[in-house]
């Protein structure tokens, strides 16, 4: 590898397609009221791809080559296909990443090394942008095959859910990934709001084994924030569950904020370790993706 040179019923009640989420929720809250404000409410959207070079599991991950292109470029190219984003930037504290991104045409915002996670990096980048935005989409740079429809889905879910400050997406978890701590699991309530996220298996049954018949949910890295809340988030102190699980979204839940979750039909292909690169490349060859 080289771096860059240029089915329970309760579950079913909230499972909605990301693209149709807007219509379904709008009907629930009153289509007339929703349509009357849709052009103004959370309408300006920016996608931010936070990227850092240092990583305990995979140093230099954003720049790793995937079939001839750096991973950060592949994520950026997929993100540009989303119809809800008015602008896309890469936020990084590393000049190597910045130089690479500028080389393929991406806008770059330099951020400080003190950012503790991608969400804080997004907030710092947002403050440095000249234009004002209502929604910020945190697009994980290690999802080179992210579907643009998923980006659109989480944006629309946040736009039509006024009491939520955060939205994200989940997909079905493969039984063999049930005990993998790199595969974050999620449980939701009957209205589609997040209850909890964990690196462990949730829910966890008395047998201590993965139930192949239970619809476990896998969290996808894509996250959408109300821009005003993003500033609040950065000022909140780290919380016990967030620190124990090392999952930044838990700070949102621990402080009592609501998070909307949509379920999508998507096979997750994140890059967590060097071994994942070969898997991604094999899949892309199978799909004739260049």
Curated annotation (Swiss-Prot):
Tissue specificity as recorded in UniProt: Expressed in roots, leaves, stems and siliques.
Swiss-Prot/TrEMBL catalytic activity: 3-deoxy-alpha-D-manno-oct-2-ulosonate + CTP = CMP-3-deoxy-beta-D-manno-octulosonate + diphosphate
GO terms for cellular component: mitochondrial outer membrane; mitochondrion; nucleus
Keyword Cell wall biogenesis/degradation set for record: yes
Cofactor(s) the protein requires to work: Mg(2+)
Subcellular location: Mitochondrion outer membrane
pH dependence remark: Optimum pH is 9.5.
Enzyme class: transferase
Membrane topology, from the record: Peripheral membrane protein
Modulation of this protein's activity: Inhibited by 2beta-deoxy-Kdo.
Annotated metabolic or biological route of this protein: Nucleotide-sugar biosynthesis; CMP-3-deoxy-D-manno-octulosonate biosynthesis; CMP-3-deoxy-D-manno-octulosonate from 3-deoxy-D-manno-octulosonate and CTP: step 1/1
Main subcellular location: mitochondrion
Keyword Transferase: yes
Keyword list, A-Z: Cell wall biogenesis/degradation, Magnesium, Membrane, Mitochondrion, Mitochondrion outer membrane, Nucleotidyltransferase, Transferase, Transit peptide
EC number: 2.7.7.38
Anything else known: Rhamnogalacturonan II (RG-II) RG-II is a structurally complex pectic polysaccharide present in the primary cell wall. RG-II consists of a linear 1,4-linked a-Dgalacturonic acid backbone with four distinct side chains, two of which contain apiosyl residues. Boric acid forms a diester with two apiosyl residues from separate RG-II molecules, thereby covalently cross-linking two RG-II molecules as a dimer.
Family to which the UniProt record says this protein belongs: Belongs to the KdsB family.
PANTHER family registered for this protein in UniProt: 3-DEOXY-MANNO-OCTULOSONATE CYTIDYLYLTRANSFERASE, 3-DEOXY-MANNO-OCTULOSONATE CYTIDYLYLTRANSFERASE, MITOCHONDRIAL
General function of this protein: Catalyzes the production of the sugar nucleotide CMP-3-deoxy-D-manno-octulosonate (CMP-KDO). CTP is the preferred nucleotide donor, but it can partially be replaced with UTP. Activates KDO during the biosynthesis of rhamnogalacturonan II (RG-II), a structurally complex pectic polysaccharide of the primary cell wall. RG-II is essential for the cell wall integrity of rapidly growing tissues and pollen tube growth and elongation.
Name under which the protein is recorded: 3-deoxy-manno-octulosonate cytidylyltransferase, mitochondrial
């Amino acid at each position: 590898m080289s771096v860059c040179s240029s089915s329970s019923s309760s579950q079913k009640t909230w499972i909605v397609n990301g693209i149709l989420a807007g219509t379904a929720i709008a009907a629930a809250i009153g289509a007339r009221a929703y349509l009357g404000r849709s052009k103004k409410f959370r309408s300006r959207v920016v996608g931010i791809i936070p990227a850092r070079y240092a990583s305990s599991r995979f140093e230099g991950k954003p720049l790793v080559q995937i079939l001839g292109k750096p991973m950060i470029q592949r994520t950026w190219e997929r993100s540009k296909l989303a119809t809800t984003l008015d602008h896309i930037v890469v936020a990084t504290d590393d000049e190597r990443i910045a130089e690479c991104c500028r080389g393929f045409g991406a806008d770059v915002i330099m951020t400080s090394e003190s950012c503790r996670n991608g969400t804080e990096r997004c907030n710092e980048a947002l403050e440095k942008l000249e234009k004002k935005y209502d929604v910020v989409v945190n697009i994980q740079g290690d999802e080179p095959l992210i579907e643009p429809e998923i980006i659109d889905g989480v944006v629309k879910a946040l736009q039509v859910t006024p009491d939520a400050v955060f939205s994200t997406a989940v997909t079905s978890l493969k039984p063999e990934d049930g005990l993998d701590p790199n595969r974050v699991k999620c449980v939701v309530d009957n209205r589609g709001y997040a209850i909890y996220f964990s690196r462990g298996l949730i829910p966890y049954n008395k047998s201590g084994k993965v139930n192949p018949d239970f619809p476990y949910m896998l969290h996808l890295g894509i996250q959408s924030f109300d821009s005003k809340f993003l500033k609040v988030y950065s000022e909140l102190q780290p919380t016990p569950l967030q620190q124990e699980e090392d999952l930044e979204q838990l700070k949102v839940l621990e402080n009592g904020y609501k998070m909307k979750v949509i379920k999508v039909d998507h096979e997750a292909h994140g890059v967590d370790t060097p071994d994942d690169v070969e898997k991604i490349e094999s899949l892309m060859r199978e799909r004739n993706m260049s």
